[in-house]
Amino acid sequence: MPVNEYGQMIGEPVDDTPGVLPSLVRIEGQYTIIEALSVEKHAEDLLAVYGPDTPREMWTYLFQPPVENLEELIVALKQMLERKDRFYYAIIDKATGKALGTFSLMRIDQANRTIEVGA
């Protein structure tokens, strides 16, 4: 491992070619599936997660309140998917086949090969 002028071990140099954008490829794990968010496929399941019966403390650090009904959720999901600077995914429980939540890959900086996982 390389050592700097202070005698500290440092990592190997990283290739400086720009990173590539993520793809919305489906990823299957032991307990969950990650797939591209779809209004048609996931909205009804997500109402249980983001709807009016959701515990209020779940929303402490989020920028929006829970939705009141399915129609409001559909509008919100469509607005999310219109964004071209984020990649939205649904998290699916393999045992039930139901969507348990969502996340996005955002603040993508290809030049510095960084990405943030968020809401």
Where are these regions (language model features)?
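GNAT-family acyltransferases
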Residues: 1-119
